[in-house]
Structure formats: C-alpha cells, structure tokens
Amino acid sequence: MAQTFLFTSESVGEGHPDKICDQISDAILDACLKDDPFSKVACETASKTGMVMVFGEITTRSQIDYQKVIRNTIKSIGYDDSEKGFDYKTCNVLVAIEQQSPDIAQGLHYEKALEELGAGDQGIMFGYATDETPEKLPLTILLAHKLNAAMSVARRDGSLPWLRPDTKTQVTIEYEEENGAVIPRRVDTIVVSAQHADSISTEDLRSEILEKIIKPTVPAHLLDEKTVYHIQPSGRFVVGGPQGDAGLTGRKIIVDTYGGWGAHGGGAFSGKDYSKVDRSAAYAARWIAKSLVAAGLARRCLVQLSYAIGVAEPLSIFVNTYGTSSKTSAELVEIIRKNFDLRPGVLVKSLKLQTPFYLSTASYGHFTDQSKPWEQPKELKF
C-alpha cells in the first residue's frame, strides 16, 4: 500500500490587510522603476483603520506622488467606501521615506558595470518546484490562490455583489508518496472565509460560495463525499481589511511562495528592488528548481542560494531532489553553475527585473503567473 499523507496550504485575497501592504509597497516600487530603472527601493507599509503609513529608504530619479500611488492601489483592491471598513478617498496617508544609506550604497559598487553589482545584503534564499501540476507548483497552494482569485472575480463582475475584498482560503490535500515525488489524490478539506456585506445571511453565503466559487474552481475528480467544507466557520465576517486587523508588508511570505512546501529563507519580497537578493535570488532559485524539473532531471527539487553584502557571486548552492533524480547533488550543482549566472547584476537582465511588473506579483503568489521570466524554464546544457 502506497504511503499517503495530508498537507495543507493557505492563501489570502487582495483585501487582506497584510496583502494590501504588500501591494502598496510594490506599487511604489513600480512607480520608481517606471522612470528610473536603477531606483533603489526598500519600502515598507503598515495599515490600520483609516490609516496607511509607508516608510523606508528610496533613492530614485522618478518623481513619485506617494498619495496618488497609495490611494489608487487601495481603490483598485476595492476599498472604496467606508461601509466596507476602508476608503481610499478618506484614509489618512503618512509617508516617512529617506534615501538609501550611503554605507550600503558604497558597499554595492554602483560605479562598476552592472554585472559586478554586489548583493544588497547577506541572506539565504530557497526555490522549489514539483511535477504535480503543469505550473510545477504544489497543488495545495495553487488551489488556495485560485479560490481567492475566483472570489475577487465574482466580487468585481457582480455575480457575488455582497463579497468584500478581505478573503482567506486553506486547502488540505491527501497525497501519495512515490519514490520521493508527491501525487495529489483528493482534496480532504477546504476552508473559506470571506468578508461580506451585512445584507447576506450566513446560510446563503455558504451555499453561494460552495456552488459559485469552490465547485467551478476545484477539479471535480478531486472532490468526493468525504471532502470537508468549512465555509465561513466563524459565522459573521463584516468587519475586515485593516479595520479588522493591522496590516504589514512581508507578513505573508509563505502565501507568496510555496505554501509551506520546500523551505523559506525568511526574506520578504514586496517593496524591494532587484539589488535586494531576498527577492531577486529567491526568483532565481525558483527559476533553477523549475528548470531542473522541466528538464526531467528531478520530479521535486529544492534549491538554496546564499549571498554576502557587496559580493556578487553566491557563496553556496545546495540542491535536494528528495530521491527523485538519477544524478547526485554534486552533479546537479555543477549543472546549475554551468547554466546559470547568479550574480544579481546578471539576474537583473536574465529575469528582466528592471520591469515595473511587481504589483502583479503581490497577490496570489509570486510564482503563479506563468508569463513571468522566472517561470519560463531555461533549456539546460548537460
């Protein structure tokens, strides 16, 4: 009998307070990069009832209207009325932005060629890929994202007009292990919580989310009579967004990545330009892991990179294929070294990291949009 186990991942919608902050930080990063691709940005956001504060270090030639960028982001998320607990028109916006520290700037060698740009800090970054879905992402996190995205669509197109932007989902899948690879067999449990208008009853909300969100989103063959649904387990959820909880950039790093699979080095992504290896090298590690799986070199793969401030080359490369590769870890590391130049100033070019596309990564995961450069597997020579 094959060994089975349950694994769970969660995701949150655009209106979750922490995700609002991620999106504001990345909207500011995009605004900086739009007119100055060499902008240096480290932008944090905090939010609570009726208030947003952005703070950090930004060095850019772009003229940024922070008020406008922040309010437009909140508006596009859907908080456009105080009845929803937050309103882009009336919220208080505080800005405490300074220039990048000259000590950090001199350590990164901006005066040299871009290829020789030193890493913006020390740190460890991980990338993960698995052959269980075409996207090479764990199905648990993929379905959790898709459920939140479906609620966003239903809220915007009017099919579920009582929905509000703050949503949360969690998906538990029963997996079978096969020589280190994992195969999803069925969905065991689905949890959905959604902020809603006062006008809808909990009973109606539960049946509408089951019929209009869960059933069209989750493949029918994965649902069975044993699947458990916890829809709005708290009952009411009218007070949401920053009114319900304080929000902070960088508090949803597992939602942003692999839903608990693989590993995480601890560095958040949003609000950071490409010189911050927390972001650029984590994208590169994902690119490597996905390329190895796509090339048939492994069915599951975890890659670790590490850097030191001011040093361009990674200090170490580690690969774990969970016993799914015919090659040794040392052979795979050699393949990585031959195929990938992992200096931050080269990653900028190979992954197009000066493009102002970061706001689009700040909700529903950084590895779900298959058009992004790090999601295009590289053809490997080995």
UniProtKB/Swiss-Prot annotation:
CDD domains: S-AdoMet_synt (cd18079). Its EC number is 2.5.1.6. L-methionine binds at residues 57, 100, 245, 276. GO terms for biological process: methionine metabolic process; one-carbon metabolic process; S-adenosylmethionine biosynthetic process. GO terms for molecular function: ATP binding; metal ion binding; methionine adenosyltransferase activity. Mg(2+) binds at residue 10. ATP binds at residues 16, 166-168, 234-237, 245, 251-252, 268, 272, 276. GO terms for cellular component: cytosol; nucleus. InterPro entries: ADOMET_SYNTHASE_CS, S-AdoMet_synt_C, S-AdoMet_synt_central, S-AdoMet_synt_N, S-AdoMet_synthetase, S-AdoMet_synthetase_sfam. It holds the Pfam family S-AdoMet_synt_M. It is an enzyme of class 2 (transferase). Its cofactor is Mg(2+); K(+). Binds 2 magnesium ions per subunit. The magnesium ions interact primarily with the substrate. Binds 1 potassium ion per subunit. The potassium ion interacts primarily with the substrate. Keywords: ATP-binding, Magnesium, Metal-binding, Nucleotide-binding, One-carbon metabolism, Potassium, Transferase. K(+) binds at residue 44. It catalyses: L-methionine + ATP + H2O = S-adenosyl-L-methionine + phosphate + diphosphate. It comes from the Eukaryota. Pathway: Amino-acid biosynthesis; S-adenosyl-L-methionine biosynthesis; S-adenosyl-L-methionine from L-methionine: step 1/1. Belongs to the AdoMet synthase family. Catalyzes the formation of S-adenosylmethionine from methionine and ATP. The reaction comprises two steps that are both catalyzed by the same enzyme: formation of S-adenosylmethionine (AdoMet) and triphosphate, and subsequent hydrolysis of the triphosphate. This is S-adenosylmethionine synthase. It comes from Schizosaccharomyces pombe (strain 972 / ATCC 24843). The gene is sam1.
